């Protein structure tokens, strides 16, 4: 779908399930569709720009509605599995079937239960049937291809034994290796090895004591320049960057407005903060604006005092949906209602934007409009850890108040060097164009892979520019079947079901990489097509008409005069 003539590229298109657009951003303000149409007629549309240039891409996200028959059959499938689960529990109770799962001791029957009834039931009767699809051990670099250690289970997936065989050259469609820096050769590896010889593997101290290396300060200065912010701070763990820093930013008397599909690290951080939490519908600006209005009008519960702070939590790319945050509209609402914005760019930094600077650059926005810019080094940079960027006052405050900064040990020196070298490569400071080529290759792979899957008839979620590609499976039996069939064909994929997704929205999640060649993608697509026919997964009623292959070039992000 393309925007109307004269329309803004950031307009949200109508979803395949019939959901309508929630309005548009025009000149920094949220305007209704009617107002936007009137402005367009008057020739007053102001496009979102990047450094004075026009961002011309349509903002297309597809969330096709689950076909009614598929939804019914999915519920029936869960019903049958539940029925057999109760039957097996009955057999276990009478010692007819061997019991492998953890049970409460009779002596502790009056204690608070360690296991919630439904979760325990789901784990032993549904999850165990397909447990072999997760926690598969690999024994190689997580590049475009990986080696997987083969294992077997003789007790219905309650335990596994290694066979000693190695499945070689499995196409890796599951790792977050977006720019292909997860490798054991090249400049990054050589630089990390050199630093390992000089500094060793660990620091054995916190930053505030004797664990603050010159490499750490070099990294933080580089991250700040990369993001276009005043200062930045690096942390040893991406998950802890969220969960340990949010409590330092807000507390009792503050309000957190969180997207309903935010990552578990954001959810945990919000809960640990002690602030009041309210949830808005995923990427829905009407829902967010209503919560903002209510927060200002009604204030805190009981006392009706104004909130000390209102913090909006969003992600750049949502890792289960493949959707991209509607950042221009979030920023417009944040400014309008004087809230703060916390942006998690774990999946979007390096993967979006003409030069890989994330969702802020993708929309051509000013980094200063985002109060807290968070991201991780675990994905596009092929390393570990996370960062927070923003104003110098913010970073100075976090250095003394963040649990992750004060109590956690510092990043490993070779890991720091891996991040520095890969980031300089992306920025072009290594004297080559390799980084830019990787960003371009990822964008090309993303659009090609998504388009081909839609042409085959699969239901694909998310934004067309997102390298996270969810393929909907729906039925519980097809979760395990898809993962096993793909591995038989030497394709490693991630399959996801409840409770990580809604109960009828099980899916396979592909993560694309700049390391994937067209031959690798074509091989994977061929096998996906065959498995899709075998398992009858082609549910889409909006199959795309195949197009001629068109190369991805710089005109995709063409800058023009307004």
From Swiss-Prot:
Effect in UniProt of substituting residue 305 to A: Reduces the dimerization propensity with SPTLC1. Does not impair enzymatic activity
Annotated consequence of substituting residue 134 to A: Loss of catalytic activity with L-serine and palmitoyl-CoA as substrates
GO cellular component, one term: endoplasmic reticulum membrane
SUPFAM superfamilies, sorted: PLP-dependent transferases
EC number: 2.3.1.50
Residue intervals passing through the bilayer: 67-87
GO terms classed as biological process: adipose tissue development; ceramide biosynthetic process; positive regulation of lipophagy; sphinganine biosynthetic process; sphingolipid biosynthetic process; sphingomyelin biosynthetic process; sphingosine biosynthetic process
Pfam families on file: Aminotran_1_2
UniProt keyword terms in alphabetical order: Acyltransferase, Disease variant, Endoplasmic reticulum, Lipid metabolism, Membrane, Neurodegeneration, Neuropathy, Pyridoxal phosphate, Sphingolipid metabolism, Transferase, Transmembrane, Transmembrane helix
Cofactor requirement: pyridoxal 5'-phosphate
Stretches of the chain forming a coiled coil according to its record: none
Catalysed transformations (reactions): L-serine + hexadecanoyl-CoA + H(+) = 3-oxosphinganine + CO2 + CoA; octadecanoyl-CoA + L-serine + H(+) = 3-oxoeicosasphinganine + CO2 + CoA
Topology in membrane: Single-pass membrane protein
Listed result of changing residue 182 to P: In HSAN1C; reduced activity with L-serine as substrate; increased activity toward L-alanine resulting in the accumulation of 1-deoxy-sphinganine
Stimuli inducing this protein: Expression at protein level is highly increased in brains of patients with Alzheimer disease. No changes are observed at mRNA level.
Protein family (similarity comment): Belongs to the class-II pyridoxal-phosphate-dependent aminotransferase family.
Annotated disorder: Neuropathy, hereditary sensory and autonomic, 1C: A form of hereditary sensory and autonomic neuropathy, a genetically and clinically heterogeneous group of disorders characterized by degeneration of dorsal root and autonomic ganglion cells, and by prominent sensory abnormalities with a variable degree of motor and autonomic dysfunction. The neurological phenotype is often complicated by severe infections, osteomyelitis, and amputations.
Function, as annotated: Component of the serine palmitoyltransferase multisubunit enzyme (SPT) that catalyzes the initial and rate-limiting step in sphingolipid biosynthesis by condensing L-serine and activated acyl-CoA (most commonly palmitoyl-CoA) to form long-chain bases. The SPT complex is composed of SPTLC1, SPTLC2 or SPTLC3 and SPTSSA or SPTSSB. Within this complex, the heterodimer consisting of SPTLC1 and SPTLC2/SPTLC3 forms the catalytic core. The composition of the serine palmitoyltransferase (SPT) complex determines the substrate preference.
Protein name: Serine palmitoyltransferase 2
């Amino acid at each position: 779908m393309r925007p109307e003539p004269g329309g803004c590229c950031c307009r949200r298109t109508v979803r395949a399930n019939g959901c309508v657009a929630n309005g548009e951003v025009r000149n920094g303000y949220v305007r209704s569709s009617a107002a936007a149409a009137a402005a367009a007629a008057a020739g007053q549309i102001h496009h979102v720009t990047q450094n004075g240039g026009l961002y011309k891409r349509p903002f297309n996200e597809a969330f096709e509605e689950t076909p009614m028959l598929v939804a019914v059959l999915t519920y029936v499938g869960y019903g049958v599995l539940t029925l057999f689960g109760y039957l097996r529990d009955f057999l276990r109770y009478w010692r007819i079937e061997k019991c492998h799962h953890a049970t409460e001791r009779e002596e502790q029957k009056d204690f608070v239960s360690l296991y919630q009834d439904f979760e325990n039931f789901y784990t032993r009767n549904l999850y165990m049937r397909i447990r072999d699809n997760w926690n598969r051990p690999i024994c190689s670099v997580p590049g475009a291809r990986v080696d997987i250690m083969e294992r077997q289970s003789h007790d219905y997936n309650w335990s596994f034994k290694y066979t000693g065989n190695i499945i070689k050259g499995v196409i890796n469609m599951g790792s977050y290796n977006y720019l292909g820096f997860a490798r054991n050769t090249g400049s990054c590896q050589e630089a990390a090895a050199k630093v390992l010889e000089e500094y060793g593997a660990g620091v054995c101290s916190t930053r505030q004591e004797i664990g603050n290396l010159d490499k750490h300060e070099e990294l933080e200065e580089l991250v700040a320049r990369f993001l276009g912010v005043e200062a930045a701070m690096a942390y040893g763990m991406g998950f802890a960057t969220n969960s340990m820093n949010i409590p330092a930013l807000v507390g009792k008397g503050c309000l957190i407005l969180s997207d309903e599909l935010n990552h578990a690290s954001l959810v945990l951080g919000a809960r640990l903060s002690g602030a009041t939490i309210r949830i808005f519908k995923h990427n829905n600006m009407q829902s967010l604006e209503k919560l903002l209005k209510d927060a200002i009008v009604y204030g805190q519960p009981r006392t009706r005092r104004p909130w000390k702070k209102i913090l909006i939590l969003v992600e750049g790319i949502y890792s289960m949906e493949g959707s991209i945050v509607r950042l221009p509209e979030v920023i417009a609402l944040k400014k309008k209602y004087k809230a703060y914005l916390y942006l998690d760019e774990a999946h979007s930094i390096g993967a979006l934007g003409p030069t890989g600077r994330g969702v802020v650059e993708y929309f051509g926005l000013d980094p200063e409009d985002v109060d807290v810019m968070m991201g991780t080094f675990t994905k596009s940079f092929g390393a570990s850890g996370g960062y927070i960027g923003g104003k110098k006052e913010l970073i100075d405050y976090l250095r003394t108040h963040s649990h992750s900064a004060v109590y956690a040990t510092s990043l490993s020196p070779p890991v720091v060097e891996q991040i520095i070298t890969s980031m300089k490569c992306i920025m072009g400071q290594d004297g080559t164009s390799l980084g830019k080529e990787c960003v371009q290759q990822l964008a090309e792979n993303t659009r090609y892979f998504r388009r081909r899957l839609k042409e085959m008839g699969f239901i694909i979620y998310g934004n067309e520019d997102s390298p996270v590609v969810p393929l909907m499976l729906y039925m519980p039996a097809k979760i395990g079947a898809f993962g096993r069939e793909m591995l038989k064909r030497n394709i490693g994929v991630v399959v996801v079901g409840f409770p990580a997704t809604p109960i009828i929205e099980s899916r396979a999640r592909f993560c694309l990489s700049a390391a994937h060649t067209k031959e690798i993608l074509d091989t994977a697509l061929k096998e996906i097509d065959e498995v899709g026919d075998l398992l009858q997964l082609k549910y889409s009623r909006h199959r795309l008409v195949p197009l001629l292959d068109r190369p991805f070039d710089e005109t995709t992000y063409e800058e023009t005069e307004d």
